[in-house]
């Protein structure tokens, strides 16, 4: 597939997602990075977003709960270019009923080439990067070209 680019803005739109057994770890990470995260737009699946807002006071755009379609809503925003970074603390030791949605979310984040953190160490690397609060160009699939080729 041909590629094009898009610019991630300096004020990022960050999706925050966590499985039940990882919510506390994500809350701790958000709390310890509140000053940096407050400068960006936060999105989250339902339960996670409400917990983050209650614990930190940071505004969060809440989707549905993950099992009710929230993971797919976040994935759709990624595909539309409306999410610039994903922090997803998923539980590698417990299966969840919506595992296919989780795989689809991670696949879309990879297809659309956005930064993804699956654990605290990676999230710390991303938030401490000089690129975190600056514009950054990324390569993405050229969907319009792909569509045009398929319609010929």
UniProtKB/Swiss-Prot annotation:
The active site is at 71 (proton donor/acceptor). SUPFAM superfamilies: Methylglyoxal synthase-like. Keywords: Lyase. GO terms for biological process: methylglyoxal biosynthetic process. The keyword Lyase applies. Residues 6-152 form the MGS-like domain. SMART domains: MGS. One of its GO terms (cellular component) is cytosol. GO terms for molecular function: methylglyoxal synthase activity. Gene3D superfamilies: Methylglyoxal synthase-like domain. Substrate binds at residues 19, 23, 45-48, 65-66, 98. It catalyses: dihydroxyacetone phosphate = methylglyoxal + phosphate. InterPro entries: Methylgl_synth, Methylglyoxal_synth_AS, MGS-like_dom, MGS-like_dom_sf. It is an enzyme of class 4 (lyase). It comes from the Bacteria. Its EC number is 4.2.3.3. Belongs to the methylglyoxal synthase family. Catalyzes the formation of methylglyoxal from dihydroxyacetone phosphate. This is Methylglyoxal synthase.
């Amino acid at each position: 597939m041909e590629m094009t680019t898009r610019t991630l803005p300096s004020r990022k739109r960050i999706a925050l997602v966590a499985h039940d057994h990882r919510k506390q770890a994500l809350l701790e990470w958000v709390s310890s990075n509140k000053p940096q995260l407050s400068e960006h737009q936060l999105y989250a699946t339902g339960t996670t977003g409400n917990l983050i807002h209650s614990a930190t006071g940071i505004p969060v755009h809440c989707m549905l709960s993950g099992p009710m379609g929230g993971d797919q809503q976040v994935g759709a925003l990624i595909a539309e270019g409306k999410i610039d970074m994903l922090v997803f603390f998923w539980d590698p030791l417990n299966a969840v009923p919506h595992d296919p949605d989780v795989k689809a979310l991670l696949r879309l984040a990879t297809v659309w080439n956005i930064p993804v953190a699956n654990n605290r160490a990676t999230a710390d690397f991303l938030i401490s990067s000089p690129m975190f609060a600056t514009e950054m160009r990324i390569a993405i699939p050229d969907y319009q070209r792909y569509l045009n080729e398929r319609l010929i």
